[in-house]
């Protein structure tokens, strides 16, 4: 089962894209981490996800879910490099899971790397066609990228006039 958080973070330029937490069958730590992340309790979610990964009791199904949850928590904390590395590990374990690409795209969004974000959102759509979370995140990213380009264009015009 996948739980969806309506918004992960608020940025100065736009409402944040939605995350996709993973709830693992039969693993309390993975599920507790997902629940903490749903409530934007980043530190608690990261701690529980790390504890799950260190426990040695995860099934092969639970490992990618725990990595995904850790990725979300690290993103919420603003630790984008470590979050990106963790998302890549999750994708390596389960390369056809749309939510992993969604969450990696969110990191790119927060880093204002909108083309990379869109690439990952579109990749996620190949695994979950028509998904509402992905459509919303793509729309948000396109609008935010357009506003950023307009700002840069306006700043360039101001500099030229000076």
Task: Give residue ranges: language-model regions.
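Structural marker of alpha-solenoid helical repeat scaffolds
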Residues: 55-59, 93, 127
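Register position in tetratricopeptide repeats
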Residues: 38-39, 76, 110, 140-148
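Helix-start (N-cap) detector for alpha-helical repeat units in TPR-like alpha-solenoids
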Residues: 26, 60, 64, 98-99, ...
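Terminal, low-structured helical/coil segments at or just beyond the last alpha-helical repeat
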Residues: 23, 125-162
